[in-house]
Amino acid sequence: MIKKAVVGLSGGVDSSVAAWILKEQGYDVTGLFMKNWHDTTGLLQSDCHWEDDLMFAEMVAKKLQIPFHQVDLSDEYRQRVVEYMFAEYEKGRTPNPDVLCNREIKFDSFAVEARKLGGDFVATGHYCRKDEIKPGNKTIYRLLAGKDHNKDQSYFLCQVSQEQLASALFPIGELTKPEVREIAQKLGLATAQRKDSQGICFVGKVHLPTFLQQKLEAKHGNIVEIVEKETRSVFPDIAEGLPEQTISDESLSQITEPCNFTPSSGHIIGTHNGAHFFTIGQRKGMNIGGHKEALFVIGSDVEENIVYVGEGQSHPGLNRKGLFIRSEDIHWIRRDLRMETGECRDYQVRIRYRQPLQSARMFCRHKGMYIVFDKLQRGIAPGQFAAWYDGDELMGSGVIDR
């Protein structure tokens, strides 16, 4: 029996080629475009809006001679992704809307719409792969990095479940980006040379403070510079390498704790319009001169409305040895291999998209997971996702608490 695959046609080259591949493989293919955002508040003028994406998606469906539908999921997107973003930024955290979009929209709300069209599978243009193993009578799905490690997007799917993976297809996971564009060019697809989308998933490139001011009001506060040579006592002296597996909980807490800056740790050098508009590692948006090197955000206090900065990329305030994830925020894709309380395991971890995998040791405790890296990590930001891998396989992830 021919299986039906509903492809999320986004108007980009990746989903276009994904649809063609599935058709070549014998699937009954339908294209489904989802409209998730109408508001242009904060959008940069040069960015394309959803009308352009819809036009290109329709052109591809016509060229491939597949049925085409569209669905408006903007209410779901606002409630389940955008509202979460606002809430996290208000707490002084830095969310990743792309990860949430995949978990809550593409492989949930969109999948529901795909099933209404008779779809057995939901296909996307993600650069990642899926396979399955069958220990005993049980089927377990594995999420793997894409063949093109420069474009690997498995990180964005770090929160999907076994149930979501069961009906997911990633047709371009074995291809590189140049190969995808070459196929599109040979097929004469209108999307062949279209630029990749950037910025917030389904919203686009935005001026973040303007976008956030839809819900978060501007509040003037101080920017405090932490000068390394004057405050060395603030920065812990942490050795390189992985800690012993028998390390105490107290030591784990100490080496994963961020620096505790106070106004007395430095001096005021300027003002800002709201601490919740800044994230760890940010260097733009402060408009402060008089320094040899760029200033970077190394901390913030949203309650006191203070932003802490340090000069230069080598400032120790940018680097941390580890992080902590609360137990309720830990997600295992491979539930059969989840760690138990008291267990220690070595994985490769990344804390942002396209970051090279980092050697780390993970410690599962009653309150949550401590992740300690072999080398110091730059820009660990609460609210972001840490994802852990065993080789090419993404095992699980969690929201960074501190």
Say what each PLM segment does:
Residues 1-159, 169, 177-180, 185-186, ...:
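ATP-dependent adenylation/nucleotidyltransferase module used to activate substrates
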Residues 123-128, 134-402:
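AMP-forming adenylation/ATP pyrophosphatase catalytic core
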